[in-house]
UniProtKB/Swiss-Prot annotation:
Record-linked CDD domains: bHLHzip_c-Myc (cd11458)
Region (Disordered): 144-174, 203-267, 315-336
Subunit and partners: Efficient DNA binding requires dimerization with another bHLH protein.
Compositional bias of kind Acidic residues: 228-240
Job of this protein: Transforms avian and murine macrophages and fibroblasts as well as murine B-lymphoid cells.
Protein name: Viral myc transforming protein
Bias type Low complexity, positions: 212-227, 245-259
Lineage: Viruses, Riboviria, Pararnavirae, Artverviricota, Revtraviricetes
Organism of provenance: Avian myelocytomatosis virus HBI
One Pfam assignment: HLH
Length: 416
């Protein structure tokens, strides 16, 4: 039969509806405030901050270990109000070592057991209202105990060592269920022996998809068929608390970082924690953001890594090709500038040499290049005219010498 959070039930199996929205199912949507209003409580409508907090509800608690209490077999299928209050107290918190369904009402931890607050979303008002409802129920239960009413008479005794015999009459279904629980409890390991650490420090994970919602909440719901009881026994046999403890000590870096951030967010002054005796190995943190990382095999991962490296190299080449072109252009421009500077220096030196050869501008260090060229042209033309004049004088002198030589020979002949 599907569980409904909006309709109150007198059966103790559905009494955990009072603790919603701290628990939720995968198939149904629970509305804690609507259920509280239908029950006629004094809770006020939720504030906008509470609506935001409700979107990030706390995780479902793992199921409890099979109970070793058998005195419930003698009671009816519908327990009294005291048993219902005890179930609520068992869900809200208690001592992890205590294996029975009933905690001591006079214990201080029993009265102060409330749900841990989520410090990120400041959802303290909903928890305060829940604590108020539970406190009223506990006060009613203690008053009934003092008056010596039937609630005190329905208090169960200490748990027996062996499984109870199945009773006859209207309590046959409860007896059969407790008998199945006793058989399952014989195969279970006491978590308090090998796992003495509080379970609230580790973020719970999701149960298998086919798990019963009542099993997720840790409520002992009588199985409808024998196959359901066999499935519950198989789930109980799969529990390995030692392996979970070792895995808790050797966590991966991602889980440790996530849990470290959650521990920093938790207030250190709050001693109130939720403790459960049975831990489900197949758990998942739904409050954590969805992981986009996909696990690949080793060979495929190597191929992907090599492909990423090649892609990065090609991208680097594509990105560096414009830079290479720019660097080449800069080198060419730099080389051209150097050569042009050398040419100008050589031309300047030649102008200085030409200026030194021209008498008119030889002593003028600030003579312009155009003036040097003009004076050089004039100087060359003057030198050429002097050359022509000197050549003409030389020819004239040569002729004069020839004439004088001829005259000398004539004189010698005349004397002879």
């Amino acid at each position: 039969m599907p569980l409904s959070a909006s309709l109150p039930s007198k059966n103790y199996d559905y009494d955990y509806d009072s603790v919603q929205p701290y628990f939720y199912f995968e198939e149904e949507e629970e509305n804690f405030y609507l259920a509280a209003q239908q029950r006629g409580s004094e809770l006020q409508p939720p504030a906008p901050s509470e609506d935001i907090w409700k979107k990030f509800e706390l995780l479902p608690m793992p199921p409890l270990s099979p109970s070793r209490r058998s005195s419930l077999a003698a009671a009816s299928c519908f327990p009294s109000t005291a048993d219902q209050l005890e179930m609520v107290t068992e869900l809200l918190g208690g001592d992890m070592v205590n294996q029975s369904f009933i905690c001591d009402p006079d214990d201080e931890s029993f009265v102060k057991s409330i749900i841990i607050q989520d410090c990120m979303w400041s959802g303290f008002s909903a928890a305060a209202k829940l604590e108020k409802v539970v406190s009223e129920k506990l006060a009613t239960y203690q008053a009934s105990r003092r008056e010596g009413g039937p609630a005190a008479a329905s208090r169960p005794g200490p748990p027996p060592s062996g499984p109870p015999p199945p009773p006859a009459g209207p309590a046959a279904s409860a007896g059969l269920y407790l008998h199945d629980l006793g058989a399952a409890a014989a195969d279970c390991i006491d978590p308090s022996v090998v796992f003495p650490y509080p379970l609230s420090e580790r973020a719970p994970r999701a149960a298998p998809p086919g798990a019963n919602p009542a099993a997720l909440l840790g409520v002992d719901t009588p199985p409808t068929t024998s196959s359901d009881s066999e499935e519950e026994q198989e789930e109980d046999e799969e529990i390995d608390v030692v392996t979970l403890a070792e895995a808790n000590e050797s966590e991966s870096s991602t889980e440790s970082s996530t849990e470290a951030s959650e521990e920093h967010c938790k207030p250190h002054h709050s001693p109130l924690v939720l403790k459960r005796c049975q831990v489900n190995i197949h758990q998942h943190n739904y409050a954590a953001p969805p992981s986009t990382k996909v696990e690949y095999p080793a060979a495929k991962r190597l191929k992907l890594d090599s492909g990423r490296v090649l892609k990065q190299i090609s991208n680097n080449r594509k990105c560096s090709s414009p830079r290479t072109l720019d660097s080449e252009e800069n080198d060419k421009r730099r080389t051209h500038n150097v050569l042009e500077r050398q040419r100008r220096n050589e031309l300047k030196l030649r102008f200085f040499a030409l200026r030194d050869q021209i008498p008119e501008v030889a002593n003028n260090e600030k003579a312009p290049k155009v003036g040097i060229l003009k004076k050089a042209t004039e100087y060359v033309l003057s030198i050429q005219s002097d050359e022509h004049r000197l050549i003409a004088e030389k020819e004239q002198l040569r002729r004069r010498r020839e004439q004088l030589k001829h005259n000398l020979e004539q004189l010698k002949n005349s004397r002879a």
